[in-house]
Curated annotation (Swiss-Prot):
Residues annotated as catalytic: E119
Requisite cofactors: Zn(2+)
Activity regulation (record text): Inhibited by chelating agents such as EDTA and 1,10-phenanthroline.
Cofactor comment: Binds 1 zinc ion per subunit.
Site (Transition state stabilizer): Y134
UniProt xrefs under PANTHER family: NEUTRAL PROTEASE 2-RELATED, PTHR37016
Record's catalysed reaction(s): Preferential cleavage in proteins: -Xaa-|-Lys- (in which Xaa may be Pro)
The keyword Secreted belongs to this UniProt entry's keyword annotation: yes
Top EC category: hydrolase
Binding site for Zn(2+): H118, H122, D131
Keywords for the protein's UniProt record, in alphabetical order: Disulfide bond, Hydrolase, Metal-binding, Metalloprotease, Protease, Secreted, Zinc
Any single GO BP term: proteolysis
Name of protein: Peptidyl-Lys metalloendopeptidase
Length: 168
């Protein structure tokens, strides 16, 4: 990885987060490839299963899993305590980390690894998701009310990938 304004400690933490994100992405893609009809895990985060929407999610995770997270550029110069991270969708592979990121666990709900999935889904080449809602409750509600937006929501991708608590 390339680091901008990151201490040695934070570089180590980012290497671990990148590794976790790579695992999450690979596992999400593997799951989608082996579950091509409705499952609790899919419908919880993306709503009613229809093939066209499934194919969109599959495309997103296929792209995300082909990223090498350890080759991203990580910028540690943001100190906003209320923000995890942000990207410019057209500037592929450049992620700015903020205060909330450093307080997150490496894996699990709202984790560092999951944050990198969230941010990578915003990159245009990975699907260009938006932020329609934040949080698990919001994402689950969106899946029920508007699956078309759920498949375009970054947190929905993060929670599907983190799969915590685990859903079949």
């Amino acid at each position: 990885a390339t680091f901008v304004g990151c201490s040695a400690t934070r570089q180590t933490q980012l290497n671990a987060a990148a590794s976790q994100a790579q695992t999450y992405a690979a596992n999400a893609l593997s799951y989608l490839n082996s579950h091509t009809s409705s499952t609790t895990r899919y419908t919880t985060w993306f709503g009613t299963f229809v093939t066209s929407r499934y194919n969109t999610v599959l495309s997103h995770f296929s792209s995300i899993s082909s990223n090498t997270f350890s080759s991203y550029t990580f910028d540690c110069t943001c100190s906003d305590s209320g923000t995890y991270a942000f990207v410019n969708p057209s500037n592929f592979g450049y992620v700015t980390l903020c205060g909330a990121f450093w307080n997150a666990p490496v894996a699990g709900t709202d984790s560092r690894g999951g944050t990198l999935i969230h941010e990578s889904s915003h990159f245009t080449r990975n699907g260009g998701t938006d932020d329609h809602v934040y949080g698990q409750a919001g994402a689950q509600s969106l899946a029920r009310s508007n699956p078309a937006q759920a498949i375009d929501n970054a947190d929905s991708h993060e929670y599907f990938a983190e799969n915590n608590p685990a859903l079949a």
